Amino acid sequence: PHFYPQNETPARFLERRKGAGARLEGAIASLPDHGAGLPRRILGAEVYYFDELWRMDPVALSALCIGDTGILMVEMPSDSWGHRVFDCLEKLIYQQNVRPMIAHIDRCYKAVQDPEALDALIGQGLLIQMNAGALSGLMSRRNAYQWIRAGRIHRIGSDCHNMKDRKPELSGAMAWTRKHLDEAVAEELFAKAGS
């Protein structure tokens, strides 16, 4: 789920997430096959960026990470990223010992005004995730391909929110990636969280 620090405290969010996780596990347990064959579920959060994110309580910040991976999904602003953004991401890495993963970069390519600063942070441990939908349109596919070839994309995800209008559609993106990139690259881009 999304964590918007301007709307709720980390403690309130974690309680809400715990309840949602329990409801999901209960629904899966009630299936005839008890969810055999379903992917492993790992709790995490997509944390909305704010300049003081790096100042959050370390325990709360760790609890927002994907399971025990130390990876924090961060939803970035769509306006231009100045040095304050890069400073915050760097402080998450070095002062909080958290690996930020920028969520759905395909929504904010243009916000990256300093690709060299982004590449430097990638070299320090920053991860970047792209939505599978970025590989469906001609223009978005061109940008996605350039970012993947430049080594800036570490994971491709579905951005699934529900089973109606935000389904986990990965097969088309996976097929395209396997066709146009090395098989090993495709496997890495679609790897499970924490691997």
Regions of interest found by a model, annotated:
Residues 3-7, 49-50, 107-112, 135-139, ...:
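Active-site environment of divalent metal-dependent phosphoester hydrolases
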Residues 116, 127-130, 135-143:
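A C-terminal functional module that forms or caps the active site or interfaces directly
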Residues 67, 150-151:
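Structured loop/turn residues at beta-strand edges in well-structured enzyme cores
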Residues 7-129:
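Extended substrate/RNA-proximal surfaces in nucleic-acid metabolism proteins
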Residues 142-145, 151-153:
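Flexible, acidic glycine-rich loops studded with aromatic residues
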